[in-house]
């Protein structure tokens, strides 16, 4: 019996997800379902969830890369919320995007105002150089 077309019969074809077709790790189908369920618009185009999944995947990869660098700088092999906080707050664009976001257990950025630091006197510096 002929399948009516070229290639394999419809029962033999291997199905592939929209995420794999787009080369993404984030779930395109789930994002599409959530967009429809959220009543953001009456209709959701087929390209919208692919684009949104790509943007979310890029942001996640960017934050995780910076957080991994922060963890490595602190000689740790596990990313904790503190590393996420340091990564986001030290990056200008991510800090602007997530400026109003509070990261639980993230702590604060270390900063001491210049006025609060001890004053270095020139007399002590000269005395130490002469000895």
Swiss-Prot record:
Subunit structure as annotated in this protein's UniProt entry: The nucleosome is a histone octamer containing two molecules each of H2A, H2B, H3 and H4 assembled in one H3-H4 heterotetramer and two H2A-H2B heterodimers. The octamer wraps approximately 147 bp of DNA.
Organism: Cryptococcus neoformans var. neoformans serotype D (strain JEC21 / ATCC MYA-565) (Filobasidiella neoformans)
Major subcellular site: nucleus
A GO MF term: DNA binding
UniProt protein name: Histone H2A
Low complexity: compositionally biased ranges: 8-23
Modified residues (Phosphoserine): 128
Pfam families xref list: Histone, Histone_H2A_C
């Amino acid at each position: 019996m002929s399948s009516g077309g070229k290639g394999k019969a419809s029962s033999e074809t291997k199905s592939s997800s929209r995420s794999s077709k787009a080369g993404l790790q984030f779930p395109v189908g789930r994002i599409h379902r959530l967009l429809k369920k959220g009543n953001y618009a009456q209709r959701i185009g087929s390209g919208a969830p692919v684009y949104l999944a790509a943007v979310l995947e890029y942001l996640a990869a960017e934050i995780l890369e910076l957080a991994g660098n922060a963890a490595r700088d602190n000689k740790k092999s596990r990313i904790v919320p503190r590393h996420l906080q340091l990564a986001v707050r030290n990056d200008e664009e991510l800090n602007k995007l997530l400026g109003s976001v509070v990261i639980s257990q993230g702590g604060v950025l270390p900063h001491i105002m210049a006025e609060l630091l001890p004053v270095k006197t020139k007399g002590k510096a000269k005395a130490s150089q002469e000895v």
